[in-house]
Amino acid sequence: MAKAEKGVSAKKIAQERVDILFERAKEARDEPELSARYVSLAREMAMKQRVRLAHYHRRSFCPSCHAYFIPGTNLRVRIQHGKIIYTCGICGAVTRIPLNKKTESR
């Protein structure tokens, strides 16, 4: 077996970089291609290092085209039948999130 590395773990570094990339995507709202690229890089890094994305990161981009959501610009939000419905304005993908006491407390 390989020895564990001393110092900061690779997963912790990856999580910090994912957070930074999502911050950059938020700052680059005016440039949709750049913000989508930041989101794609963050997802790739998280998948490669097997780091889970936080729920607020998972819901901040389109799962289909990886566009960073900006409500009113490229995102339509509706509440119907006990679900929050996100509709991407770029690709038209629909994401349904159950609305229950668990999600309200987050």
UniProtKB/Swiss-Prot annotation:
- GO CC annotations? COPII vesicle coat; ribonuclease P complex
GO biological process terms held by the UniProt record: endoplasmic reticulum to Golgi vesicle-mediated transport; intracellular protein transport; tRNA 5'-leader removal
Q: How is the cofactor bound?
A: Binds 1 zinc ion per subunit.
The protein's predominant localisation is: cytoplasm
In its keyword annotation, does this UniProt entry include Zinc?
Answer: yes
An example of a Pfam family matching this protein is Rpr2
Q: Name one GO molecular function term.
A: ribonuclease P activity
Q: Which cofactor does it need?
A: Zn(2+)
Please state the Enzyme Commission number of this protein. 3.1.26.5
Compartments it resides in? Cytoplasm
Which reactions is this enzyme annotated as catalysing? Answer: Endonucleolytic cleavage of RNA, removing 5'-extranucleotides from tRNA precursor
Q: What start-end ranges are recorded for coiled-coil regions in this protein?
A: none
- Residue positions annotated to bind Zn(2+) are 62, 65, 88, 91
* Keywords of the record: Cytoplasm, Endonuclease, Hydrolase, Metal-binding, Nuclease, tRNA processing, Zinc
Oligomeric state and interaction partners are given as: Consists of a catalytic RNA component and at least 4-5 protein subunits.
Q: Which family does it belong to?
A: Belongs to the eukaryotic/archaeal RNase P protein component 4 family.
Give the protein's function.
Part of ribonuclease P, a protein complex that generates mature tRNA molecules by cleaving their 5'-ends.
Mind telling me what this protein is named?
Answer: Ribonuclease P protein component 4
Organism, by scientific name, is Methanocorpusculum labreanum (strain ATCC 43576 / DSM 4855 / Z)
The organism's taxonomy opens as: Archaea, Methanobacteriati, Methanobacteriota, Stenosarchaea group, Methanomicrobia
